[in-house]
Amino acid sequence: MAEKEHYVRTKPHVNIGTIGHVDHGKTTLTAAITTVLAKKGLAQAEDYSQIDAAPEEKERGITINTAHVEYETEKRHYAHMDAPGHADYIKNMITGAAQMDGAILVVAATDGPMPQTREHILLARQVGVNSIVVFLNKCDLVDDPELIDLVEMEVRDLLSEYGYPGDDVPVVRGSALKALEGDEEAQKKIEELMDVVDEYIPTPERETDKPFLMPVEDVFTITGRGTVASGRIDRGTVKVGDSVEIVGLVEKVLTSVVTGLEMFHKTLDLGEAGDNVGVLLRGVDRDQIVRGQVLAAPGSIKTHKTFKGQVYILSKDEGGRHTPFFSDYRPQFYFHTTDITGEIELPEGTEMVMPGDNTEFSVTLIKPAAIEVGTKFTIREGGRTVGAGQVTEIDD
């Protein structure tokens, strides 16, 4: 195997992503950011088709898979995730949104906030994305500046509605396509956006002192070397030689030793919270580990089947259910990176839960999940998100 380039950590690292309604220009903006930063030698310019390249979407022209792009500003190193915009593929938004320290919300000035704008803001809030910066795109297509003011007000109100500081959120107006085409004014706006991202989205306090935990997103085999699990480190640190446990979905916990570590296809000495890494595991067969399990410091997390959760159930207008549900309702609970069916039991005195309600209830899962108090989840049925919440109590 060829010797890999070594990843050197010099600037603080931040995970961000683009969110917003389909066709509002998320991927075009991602391409524009890399193109503008490439002129300063801080990125490799990625064109739209490179970022948009996921096999399933070719026939349909909708972003399905999550693209990771890396670039730098003068101050920081960024991993940028392009979140899918289409409601059918909200599942990737959920695995993706969990990977963001902050987000750039893209809203087309020609349209204003649309249903998925709202859904992405809600999901960002529920999966703990605490800082959002707004890019009003396609401003070159709106003649009347008062109309753009109106769209900006609507976006600020919407952010406030979901608990973001709508009045203080920075809003940058521009045109991603114009910037991509080389328009100087438009490129200045992209620079302004990145300055705002540098300043407004705080460098995350990495949870490096907590025990290591990494939800497994993907598993593959390197011939002659063994099995690799990849994902974003949730907390703690990991290095070659560490013992780890593979926890979740089955009762039995498997123990292994880390024999290799990579980030951005470069070898890494130490992986820390927030890093997207590949972990090479000793003595683990490809079929002994699956997406949805976690790698964890030995003894730090256990599997559970029953818990209480504080949950927000989406209203009909947010794309949620149209009808209430009762005890014994059996949707899917999306933990870390996988769906597990669970049966809901409503608390005494609550006969039913209406779309739009905030509530707490008990859940019994059909498979054990690696969860603890504070673990976030979404509730899904038939491929759509109907609720989101977090674990408030473990009951088994």
UniProtKB/Swiss-Prot annotation:
Question: Which keywords does this Swiss-Prot/TrEMBL entry list?
Answer: Cytoplasm, Elongation factor, GTP-binding, Hydrolase, Magnesium, Metal-binding, Nucleotide-binding, Protein biosynthesis
Q: Which GO terms describe its molecular function?
A: GTP binding; GTPase activity; translation elongation factor activity
Query: Which parts of this chain are annotated as the region G4?
Result: 137-140
What EC numbers are recorded for this enzyme?
Answer: 3.6.5.3
Where, in this chain's numbering, is Mg(2+) bound?
Answer: T27
**Sequence segments annotated as region (G3):** 82-85
Domain tr-type G, residue spans: 11-205
The record's region (G1) falls at: 20-27
Q: What is this protein called?
A: Elongation factor Tu
Q: Which family does it belong to?
A: Belongs to the TRAFAC class translation factor GTPase superfamily. Classic translation factor GTPase family. EF-Tu/EF-1A subfamily.
Listed under catalytic activity are:
GTP + H2O = GDP + phosphate + H(+)
Subunit relationships: Monomer.
Q: What is the lineage of its organism?
A: Bacteria, Bacillati, Bacillota, Bacilli, Lactobacillales
Gene Ontology cellular component annotations, sorted alphabetically? cytosol
Where is it mostly found?
A: cytoplasm
User: Which Pfam families does this chain map to?
Assistant: GTP_EFTU, GTP_EFTU_D2, GTP_EFTU_D3
Subcellular location(s) of the protein: Cytoplasm
**Region G5: what ranges?**
175-177
Which annotated residues bind GTP?
20-27, 82-86, 137-140
Q: Which domain of life does the protein's organism represent?
A: Bacteria
Give me the ranges of the annotated region G2: 61-65
Broad class of enzyme this protein falls into = hydrolase
The task this protein performs is described as: GTP hydrolase that promotes the GTP-dependent binding of aminoacyl-tRNA to the A-site of ribosomes during protein biosynthesis.
